[in-house]
Structure formats: C-alpha cells, structure tokens
Amino acid sequence: MAGTTPVAFDPAPLHLGLVMTFTATTKVLAGQIVSHHATGVSRAVIPATNATAGALGVALHTAEAGELVSVAMNGSVVKIMLSTDDGTADAGDWIGVSTVAGCGVVRDAAIHAHEATAGLGNAIGIALDDIAAGASTVGGTGYILISISPPWTAVS
C-alpha cells in the first residue's frame, strides 16, 4: 500500500468540548491531530506524529505557519483520519498518533500490559465509529471522542 498523504478535511464536530487557539509553527491541515511544538514554544502546535510531544487535539481549520489555529480538545467529538498503513478501527478502540503527520492509529490493547515498544506517545481518544480503510493514499475518517491520556511507555 502506498504511504498516506495527509489532506485537509472537515473534522465536522458533533460536539465541541474545550477549544483553544494556538499558533501553527508549520502548516496545519484541517482535521489533523496536533501536538505541542517540540521546542516548547508557548501555545504553538505542529501536526502530531508518534515522535512529537504530547497530542493536544484536532485542528478545526487549516492554518499556514505563523497563523492561529483553533484546536478541538478534551470532550470534543470530531472526525480524524487514520493512516492508510494502519487500516481500520472499531468503535471502542483507543486511537493514538501515527508515524504519519496528523493521522491516527489504533492503539494495541497489549499496551495496557506494558508492551515494550518505544515511541508510543499519547492516545488522542476513543473511536466512536467503526472506521473503514481509506483508498490509495488517503486514510479512512471517523468520529472519536477526544480524551487525551498520558504517554504510554514500557515498564521494565
């Protein structure tokens, strides 16, 4: 399967919980999962990957670098996009952040049993829908309840 190409899409909020405005330090697309800027710049976000700082929420609109972007946070119900490499999700699955900027991935239930995989990052929330696979380079989209959890890490 070809790699995912992040695209802007309407996150179509069903419910907005906490919403805050941040500065995009690089281009952020509508619907992308965003995280703190890695350098610790105050109130600044970038598209999240499993290698960035903790996930904050989902961008409600596209913003160029230096522009303000509204971010749906805890308690919000919005659509996210899964990475095409990560396939599908079932309602009730925990969704984390993929290696693809701004995309989600199903969190393996074994993580709760202290899986020894590094770079697991935050869970962004819980899938409310079964999310079908996308087509070609665009992942499937579906609703999640944003419920940020702390980073899951391996325990020795």
Outline where the language-model segments fall.
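Glycine-anchored, exposed beta-strand/edge motif detector
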Residues: 2-156
